């Protein structure tokens, strides 16, 4: 299942041939470099490691000048990318498995790649189904009303516990809180995958993918777009 690493730019709308207005998420996926290729006899399955973006190697400013934004690449990343023939270290590294069950069911050949190859948005086509993985927006520590959608307590008749969870378990037996009880806690900033999303448009010149609907993550967040099957 080959895919591509991209950056979520935001949402917009497009119009199809019937004149219908379709909300779309725009993902910018500049050409991904193949960093490493792993075979089945090495790790048990065929996979490819892709690199997205760029990191600066060292401080690119002279004495007295402002330091440019962005973190500096670790020497390990620089050396890892150099083995694939890259002079600039990628910002993000992700692995994509190639010999998944869907390829076997459809009796499709496993694609072959070599270090240094480029993966572009042209691997997708309008109308194709994809699944997108991103990191949802972090919302910090939240109560049960926002985190789980609880209704809260009454607003009148002297009640002061408007957003409390209420009872969290019986007292006499079993005299404990059952595992899995929905409670206040950290909300968001979790890996989330949405499946069966439709590619509405491909802009090869600007490396853009227009995907119908919403995609998890904030603006400028990193997302993985994979073929559905």
Q: What function would you assign to each model-found segment?
A:
Residues 1-229:
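Extended basic (Lys/Arg/His-rich) segments that typically form rRNA-contacting surfaces
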